[in-house]
Amino acid sequence: MTQEGKLEQQFLDYLHSERNYSVNTSTAYENDLLDFRRFLNEQAIETYQQVTFLDVRIYLTELKQKSFSRTTVARKISSLRSFYTFLLRENVIAENPFTYVSHAKNQLRLPKFFYSEEMEALFQVVYEDNETLTLRDRVLLEVLYGTGIRVSECAGILLPDLDTSYQAILIRGKGNKERYVPFGVYAEDAITDYLPKRTELMTRYKKSHDALLVNHYGDPLTTRGIRYCLTKIISKASLTRKIHPHMLRHTFATDLLNNGADMRTVQELLGHASLASTQIYTHVTKEHLKSTYMKHHPRA
């Protein structure tokens, strides 16, 4: 059995043993995987790790040309997204090329981002006072927006990871890949103001660890804890539309591209294994430009 065949079998075993899927459902998943592997062979793509977002778009086009029903296409994409989510969980791949594919309409599902006035409202919340947890939230927001790192990566930052002389942070990303990301003066000032308060809090509760971000008991702030803190900040800012913390990462990438950053640099900063994962943000900026034009130009 090939390595790709082994991965498929591991996934099918997972569906049967952990998800309790029926034989018929597992068979449908297996057929969808086989169909996709035939496509990869035709494209001379040897491994599942080599698949990019653009390959997925080509596959979707092929399914459409074969006149599959919308329901069938939706099922196939759902099967493959689940398979790649499994590979991601098993650290076989670093990025899921099916993440931003909307199977319902065979269109791009564009990442949502914060508008400038929304970012201003968020920052107003974390600069309203200099209490310990407010300073912690200030670091949280400045670092997430200023570096574009994932929430899970932010939770993993240790004090030795901070290189203040170069204004950079060592980040451990997906698949335990390490990268350095720069941070600006706002994040640096926020960290400088926060660290003495962090020390006081940890001393009070007799805690000893290197995690940069701590909760109100001085323990390391978990990924779940960060999401909770961000949700509270968003709530205090009285933002009305549906918002999630990962939008800070989307906003980081979108703002860089809108201000002239090149794609390769943004890819490296985000820690994307494939450039195709970063190219999604060019669609966001184009949509934003179009909507701004349609809204403000007198002859739009």
UniProtKB/Swiss-Prot annotation:
It holds the Pfam family Phage_integrase. It is found in: Cytoplasm. Keywords: Cell cycle, Cell division, Chromosome partition, Cytoplasm, DNA integration, DNA recombination, DNA-binding. One of its GO terms (molecular function) is DNA binding. Belongs to the 'phage' integrase family. XerC subfamily. Forms a cyclic heterotetrameric complex composed of two molecules of XerC and two molecules of XerD. Site-specific tyrosine recombinase, which acts by catalyzing the cutting and rejoining of the recombining DNA molecules. The XerC-XerD complex is essential to convert dimers of the bacterial chromosome into monomers to permit their segregation at cell division. It also contributes to the segregational stability of plasmids. This is Tyrosine recombinase XerC. The gene is xerC.
